[in-house]
Amino acid sequence: MKAAQFKWISTAAFAWLCSAALYAQETKTINNLDASSKTAYFDLETGREVTDTSDDWDIAFNRTTVLVNGGSSGKGQVTAALLKDTSFEQVTKQPANGFKADSDQEKAIPTGSGNGWYEYNMADHSISPIPGRILVIKSSSGKYAKLEILSYYNKSNYNSANYSFRYSFL
C-alpha cells in the first residue's frame, strides 16, 4: 500500500514540476507594437501596452530606442542586460552581471547601429535586428525575462517602428 502512495506522490510531484517549468518558459509574442509617433510603454507581466501616465511598465520603445523603467527613464527599479552571440532558446537563466538602468548619458540597451539590438543598412535605409542579441530585463518585482526583437516593421504595411518581439520569464 505504501509503495502505491509513494508512486502517486512522485507522479504528482513530477507533473507539477513539469507544468511549473513549462509555465516559466511560456513564450509570448507581440506583433506590431507601434512606437512610430509616440513612446510605447509595455508591461511584461500583463503582456499589454500601458499608458504613458502609468508607472506599471517594464520596457518602452521610441523609434529605435529601447528604454527601461529605471534610472533616468522611469520611477521603477527595472534594469536590463544585452546579451550577444546567443539565441533565445539558449538563454535559460539571467546573467550574473551586466544589468544597467537608463542614465542621461547612456541607455541600458545601447543606442545606435551595431551597438544595441539593430543594424542600419545605408543602401536601403532599413533597420534589422542583429541575430544573437537578446535583452534580459529585471522587473521592479525582481522577475527576469528574456526578450528578442524579431522585427522593426509592420508586416502588413511595412511601416517602421512597429515592433514585433517575443519574451518569456526565466
PLM regions and their residue ranges:
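Bacterial Sec-dependent N-terminal signal peptides
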Residues: M1-E26
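N-terminal "domain-start" segment
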Residues: Y23-L135, Y167-L170
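Generic alpha-helix signal with a bias toward terminal, lower-confidence helices
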Residues: A13, S54, N69-S73, S156-A161
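A broad, structure-centric signal for solvent-exposed, well-ordered loop/edge residues
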Residues: W8, V66-V68, Y144, S156
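Compact beta-sheet-dominated globular domain cores
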Residues: I137-L170
